[in-house]
Design a protein with these regions (language model features):
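Active-site neighborhoods and metal-handling regions in enzymes and metal-associated proteins
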Residues: 1-367
Length: 367
C-alpha cells in the first residue's frame, strides 16, 4: 500500500509540474486519502515537484498517520493548510497549486494573507486535476468495488420479502441498510432511496412513513461501501400485477438501459453515451420525464468523474467504473429507474466493452 500511494503522489507531482507550480497542496479529504491512505476530517498533503511529500494532520489522527503512512513526512498541526503553506514558504517554493474547486474563499484569504513582510508562495488554481487522477482505477480498486456491488446485490435479495404492503419506506430502508452491514460492508455508500407509489416520481426521494400498497411500483437505490469504494444500484419492483402504464415505462427504461450498457467502449464521448439511452426514451414521448444524466463515475466518492450527460465533456477510458441509470418519472403517478455499476474495459477489438459489477436481474420483479 505505501508503494501504491507513492506512485499516486508521483502522479500528483506531475500535475503540479504541468501547471508550472513547484508543488501541489491537496486539502480535500478524499484526495488526501487517495494519496496517503489516511482517513480523517482534518488533513492536507503538500507534494513538491520534485521533493518529499509532507502530510499534515492534527493530534487526533497523528498516531494513525504514523502507523499507516510511515513513508511520508508528518507534520502535526491543527491548521493543516496554513502549516503546509508556511513550510512551502520556508522551503523557498515560489508557486503552489491548490484545489480551488473545494477551498472556500475565506480559507484562501487566510492562506494568502500571511504576516506583514512575508513573501509567497503564490497560489494558483489546480481545478479538479487531482480528482481526475482518481478516475482510472487499478485492479485493487476494482476488486473493492466488485465486493461492494456483490454485498449490495446480496442485501437487496435478502430483504425482498420486506417489500410488501404495510411496510413503510423507512422500515424497508433500515432493514436493507442493516443487512448490507451484516454482510460485511464497511458502511453505506449513501442513504438509501426508497420511493413507493407516487413518490417514485421523485428521483432522490427520502424514505418516509408512507406504507407500501398493492399496485405500487417501488424504486430502491442503494449501495454498500467497502474499503472506501462505493457501489450504486437501482431496481424498481412491482407489488402485485403491474398496470399497463407501469409495464410500458418499465419496458422503455429496461431497453434504454440495456442499450446504454451495450454501447459502452473506451474512447466514447460521454455525451454520445447519454444520447444512446436518451434518444430511445425521447422517441417514446417520455423525454421530458427523464431529467437527469445517464450516469456517473464511482469510486472513493459516490459521484465522481466522468459525469455522463448530454451537456458534459469527456471520454470513457479503460478501467473507469461508471453507472448507467436511465429513468422515467411521471408526476403524481410513479416512476422507474434501473441502474447498474460497471467497468469500462478495453477489449480484444477496438470497441471494448463493459464489465458488469451489478448482478441482479433487470427483469421486472413482481412481488
Amino acid at each position: 500500500m505505501p508503494q501504491m500511494h507513492a506512485v499516486r503522489r508521483d502522479r500528483a507531482a506531475a500535475v503540479a509540474a504541468g501547471l508550472g507550480a513547484d508543488a501541489v497542496l491537496v486539502t480535500s479529504g478524499v484526495n488526501v486519502r487517495y494519496l496517503t491512505g489516511l482517513v480523517s476530517s482534518n488533513s492536507a498533503v503538500l507534494i513538491p515537484a520534485p521533493g518529499t511529500a509532507v502530510l499534515a494532520t492534527d493530534s487526533r489522527y497523528a498516531g494513525t498517520a504514523e502507523r499507516g503512512c510511515p513513508e511520508i513526512e508528518l507534520l502535526v498541526e491543527r491548521d493543516v493548510a496554513r502549516a503546509l503553506i508556511d513550510l512551502a514558504r520556508a522551503g523557498g517554493l515560489g508557486t503552489v497549486a491548490f484545489e480551488d474547486h473545494v477551498m472556500t474563499v475565506h480559507a484562501h484569504r487566510e492562506l494568502t494573507g500571511g504576516e506583514p513582510g512575508q513573501a509567497g508562495p503564490e497560489l494558483i488554481g489546480a481545478g479538479s486535476a487531482v480528482d481526475q487522477l482518481r478516475m482510472v482505477k487499478d485492479e485493487e480498486e476494482i476488486t473493492l468495488l466488485e465486493r461492494a456491488c456483490s454485498i449490495t446485490a446480496q442485501a437487496f435479495s435478502a430483504v425482498l420479502d420486506r417489500l410488501r404492503p404495510g411496510v413503510t419506506e423507512r422500515e424497508y430502508a433500515l432493514a436493507l441498510e442493516r443487512t448490507m452491514i451484516d454482510l460485511g460492508a464497511d458502511g453505506l455508500a449513501f442513504d438509501s432511496i426508497v420511493a413507493s407509489g407516487p413518490n417514485g416520481a421523485i428521483p432522490h426521494h427520502i424514505p418516509g412513513g408512507r406504507r407500501f400498497e398493492p399496485g405500487d411500483l417501488v424504486t430502491v437505490d442503494c449501495g454498500a461501501q467497502c474499503g472506501g469504494y462505493h457501489a450504486d444500484m437501482t431496481r424498481t419492483v412491482a407489488l402485485g400485477k403491474p398496470s399497463a402504464w407501469q409495464r410500458e415505462i418499465y419496458q422503455i427504461v429496461t431497453e434504454a438501459q440495456a442499450a446504454g450498457v451495450a454501447a459502452v467502449r473506451p474512447g466514447m464521448d460521454v455525451s454520445d453515451l447519454d444520447a444512446v439511452a436518451r434518444d430511445m426514451i425521447e422517441a417514446t414521448g417520455h423525454g421530458g420525464h427523464f431529467g437527469h444524466g445517464l450516469g456517473h463515475g464511482v469510486g472513493l466518492e459516490i459521484h465522481e468523474a466522468p459525469i455522463i450527460g448530454y451537456d458534459r465533456d469527456g471520454t470513457l477510458q479503460d478501467r473507469v467504473p461508471i453507472t448507467i441509470e436511465p429513468g422515467i418519472y411521471l408526476p403524481d403517478r410513479g416512476g422507474v429507474r434501473i441502474e447498474d455499476t460497471l467497468v469500462v474495459r478495453a477489449g480484444a477489438g477496438a470497441a471494448g466493452s463493459a464489465q458488469p459489477l451489478t448482478t441482479i436481474t433487470r427483469e421486472l420483479l413482481v412481488l
